[in-house]
Amino acid sequence: MTATVTQLKNGLKTRLDTITNLRAFAQQPDQVNPSLGGIAFPTLESITYHGAMGNGLVTHVFTISVIVGRAAERTTQNLMDTYLSFDDGIRAAIEGDQTLGGVAQTLIVEEASNISTVDANDTTYLTVDFRVVVYA
């Protein structure tokens, strides 16, 4: 049986929860209010069906958006550098369980992109998107 989108999002949230001080959500939160370690949430970009015979492989592409503190602060920039590194970063956390608790066959964090700023709550925050491909 193929995993549901909800199961995959919850699995991604669980992996993001392993990062100290990062507040992870299974859906985009109503308000952008990064804590000390920022916030992260998955958004489903696409689904490809019939990747193998029958219903053998369904490919889900997610964007994990990470929003950290005010862009002008040095600590925020250092935190972003940490999240982009492998050892303590988003990639290591997500790829730490490539089955997302047994609901996926495997996954890969393909890239980090769109490193930029976003305005919310009269504040400019630093943000980055991670592309995650999940094979379920």
Task: Give the residues covered by each predicted segment.
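Charged, amphipathic alpha-helical segments and their flanking helix caps
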Residues: 1-33, 43-136
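Interfaces and regulatory segments of ATP-dependent nucleotide/adenylate/phosphodiester-chemistry enzymes
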Residues: 38
